[in-house]
Every structure is written in structure tokens, then in C-alpha cells.
């Protein structure tokens, strides 16, 4: 075969593969929960708690997925996807994942770092010139004033949320609201993110770069860096570089028409702790099916399923690889899941890496969390975490905004951890004492 013919055949095969519909790739199922060191009886407590929450009208429905050693040990839906329409919650229901988008975008950014196309030490202004001279709202001599930033913001500042950029609440609201910013929501905007990020650069920020941990539009700025470096929209980049290779077939910034019936409804929790259907609009259902598909928020824009997101997190737990597809090196994953901010976040009780909350020491965190765990959550009462020591990935989905007193995301942590009764498959049995007896079993607690 000639070189030209060989190249033509390769191009043809590539086109055929691109035209073929992407098939969902199911994660392997554990033979039993006990086979991977999880108690079936104790996992059943998750089912009970979620069904009780549905019965008491504290949530319409939930999906919980537990992976151990890369195998599905628990995957159950409870309640309704849309109570008013009588649609039952299913394990393939699609959810608005809000800030769980940040991890995906951060991985996308670090892939470009690995390729040598940018550095985390670079000033943001290298890619977004409007960030060359930013300002900060400060209190000086009892008066509030807008002052120049002491230094330029770097890519690392954005990844660690130490750029000083908030969501524009509090004292900054008089600047941000007239400029058209509405917290983290961009789905209904006809402009691309470049226009919004350039506008953001003209507004004062909450803190000087590097001085505080401030949660806000940091990852949205990173998303626009990706767009400017690659020449693609963020949606195109994430689809071609992350979701398609990982076979995350139901993850996107807007729900395709043929999947619209799988999108869960959003509910708001009232003062009495019970739910009502949330209104339309940016703090309710949102325009995730009918929006203009122009602004792709790296900070809060994706929709996904529990299974898709578990595939993404298993890739991270594997050190950047899943089923032969490598997105990152193990060294980069370790860098991303290490604390970069000292005691700036949660007074040191927890740390913050490059896109993830991290646990440095069990017992210091105000909840369950083993050293090395990395996690985050979303505004619609969703959460995820990966525990390298336990070879554990957990994804929990619901759609509450606001969630009010409902705290199922914290409870599911307890419920999963109390079900760990042994090592994952392929790991040695628990250590024995000097008398030859097994060491005391792990106990549960709040």
C-alpha cells in the first residue's frame, strides 16, 4: 500500500469513527459489595435515608453512585425526576452540576499545561490582555475605595481561588449587578464568554491576588483562557478532549432535544424544610434546553449524570487514565490534588489544590475525610469525592436550589464511610495485633 493510500485510509477510518454515535461505556460492576470491602447491609442505609427524605418532601429525588476499586458497588435512584409530571428518578437522569464543572475545566487547563502551551505561573494578561491592570475594592481609613492590584493575577491564582475574584456579592454588588453579572449563571446569554470575561476585568475584585481564598469567577476566567489558547469554544474543547475520550456521553453545557425528557426538575427548599418546584429563570430551572448555546461557563455550566461524572473521577483516581485513555500524567494529578494555599482555606482544616478541595489530615477536616481525599460540590446540592487510600469514588446527585436546611450531601458521606468494612479487592487483609488477633474494625461516627 502506498503512503498516500495509507493516509487516505487512515483519514477515512477517522471520519467513520467520528460519524458513529458514541456509545455509553458502563463501569464494571462488582460481583458483590462485600467483594470490594463494603457492607451491603450498611449500604442499604443510603437507600433508607434517601427514601425517607423523599417521603418527607425534603427532596424530590436522588441518585447515589459508589465505586470501589473501579467497580460499581452501589448505584441507586430514589424518588422523582419530576414530581409534577410523575417521572421517576432513574440512574441515567441528567443533572445540572454547577460547580462540579470546575474540576472538568481545571483538568482541561492542565492538559494544555502538560502540552507546553501555557504555564500555571503565567500572568493571565498573557492570554487575556484586559487583566493587565486589575483593581480591588478596599477599605481605607474607614472609607471604601477602588485601588490598583498589587500584582498581576496568575493562572495558578485562578486554579487555587486566590486571585481575589468573587461572584460579586456584598459590597461589590453595586458594581456587578449593573454590569449584568448574576452569580454563576450564563446559560441564557447570547454573548460568548470572551465578552463577559473582558467586562469582568474592568470591575473591582474582592481581595488582592494571593492574599485570601475567595470563591468566584476564577474558573470561568480559566475557561476563557482555554478558548483563547485553543481557538475553540470551551464546549468544543471539553467535548473533543475530555468527554468524548472518556465516553461521558451525557455530559454537555446544554441538553440536546432528544435527551430533554431526562433532565431533572429543580426544587427549592422552604423555611419549613419541604420542597416546592423552583421557578423558571437563572435561579430555578434555567435555560439548559432552550438557551442560545453561546456562553459556556467553566465555573458552573455543565450538565451530567452520576455515571458520567464517576467515569471522570475514576480517571483522576487512576492517576489521569481510564480504560487506556490518558488525559494527565500521575504527577500532574498529584499536583492538582495537593494543597497549594497553606491555611488560607478553612483556616487550614482543609486545603485547596488546582481545582479541588483536598484533605491533608483525617480528623482536622470538619467531616469524614481521609488524607489525600479530593472533592467538591455543586449549587444544586450535588457532590463528589475520591479517596485514594480507600480506592473510593462517590457521586451524589439531587436538584435543590436553595437546599436550605437539607444536608444530604454531608449525610451521604457518613453513610458511605460507615459501609467500609474491609479493604478493596486486591489489597492485603487488615493488620493483626501482636497476639495474632485482627486489629479493631473501623467504626462509624458523625
Language-model regions, residue ranges each:
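N-terminal secretory signal peptides that target proteins for export/translocation
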Residues: 1-5
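Bacterial N-terminal signal peptides
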Residues: 8-20
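Boundary at the C-terminal end of the N-terminal hydrophobic targeting segment
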Residues: 22-26
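Short, conserved catalytic-motif segment at the N-terminal edge
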Residues: 28, 32-97, 119, 133-140, ...
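Active-site SXXK
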Residues: 44-51, 64, 70-72, 94-128, ...
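Short, surface-exposed loop or secondary-structure junction motifs
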Residues: 134-371
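Short, gly/Ser/Thr-rich active-site loops of penicillin-recognizing serine hydrolases
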Residues: 318-322, 331-332, 337-342, 361, ...
